[in-house]
């Protein structure tokens, strides 16, 4: 029963992630993030199985923590990619992704390294009760860091993401926003 509830919690969180990223970015970003998240969950669950860790609420919490941690890394990189698309003069996505990942790499490695150091200490000194949780987190953090760099971003290339099309949509959004603000200002002045 716990396994079924855990899988349901993971499925619900993946759906929520898909919706959130699709609203915040674009559907291709959302699919790339979900593929990355599935990668992390499969590797973490594989480690739980490989090391014969008891599946309990602690390991379920570890898997969900890995999902959140990896999603945070992925969103930071995607945000930098989106910013690069808007500001770069390049029209191809691959160089923009490369620059964006390079710009966030030191932050990603430092954050993951410090978190990993804390979880490793927790594994060795936290006692037997928390070792399963810690080991699942160790594997998940490593998988999440690698997937946000090497899985999520390159997946955008597979989905034929068009930089020019994205820029045109952003220009249209800006025009609609400007028109809306102008109409609102005219309404407030009473000139409509």
What kind of feature is each model-predicted range?
Residues 3-43, 47, 112-124:
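Internal alpha-helical transmembrane segments of multipass membrane proteins
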Residues 24-27, 51-53, 125-127, 160-161:
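Short helix-capping/hinge motifs at transmembrane helix termini and TM-loop junctions
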Residues 29-81:
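Hydrophobic transmembrane alpha-helices and their membrane-interface caps
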Residues 26, 42, 46, 70, ...:
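Transmembrane alpha-helix boundary/anchor motif
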Residues 1-2, 6, 90-125, 135, ...:
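Pore- and gate-forming transmembrane helices of large, multi-pass membrane proteins
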Residues 60-80, 102, 106, 111-118, ...:
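Transmembrane alpha-helix detector for multi-pass membrane proteins
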Residues 125-192:
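Hydrophobic alpha-helical transmembrane segments of membrane transport and translocation systems
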Residues 13, 17-20, 65-72, 140-144, ...:
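Alpha-helical transmembrane segments of multi-pass membrane proteins
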């Amino acid at each position: 029963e716990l396994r079924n509830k855990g899988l349901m919690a993971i499925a619900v969180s993946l759906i929520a992630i898909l919706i959130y990223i699709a609203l915040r970015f674009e559907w291709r970003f959302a699919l790339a993030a979900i593929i990355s998240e599935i990668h992390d969950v499969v590797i973490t669950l594989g480690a739980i199985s490989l090391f014969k860790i008891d599946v309990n609420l602690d390991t379920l919490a570890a898997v969900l923590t890995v999902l959140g941690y990896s999603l945070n890394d992925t969103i930071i990189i995607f945000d930098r990619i989106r910013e690069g698309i808007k500001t770069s003069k390049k029209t191809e996505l691959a160089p923009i992704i490369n620059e964006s990942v390079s710009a966030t790499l030191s932050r990603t490695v430092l954050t993951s390294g410090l978190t990993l150091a804390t979880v490793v200490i927790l594994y060795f000194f936290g006692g037997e009760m928390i070792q399963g949780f810690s080991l699942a987190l160790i594997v998940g953090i490593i998988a999440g860091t690698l997937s946000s760099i090497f899985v999520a971003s390159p997946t955008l290339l597979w989905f034929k993401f068009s930089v020019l099309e994205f820029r045109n949509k952003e220009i249209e959004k800006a025009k609609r926003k400007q028109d809306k603000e102008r109409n609102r200002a005219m309404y407030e002045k009473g000139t409509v």
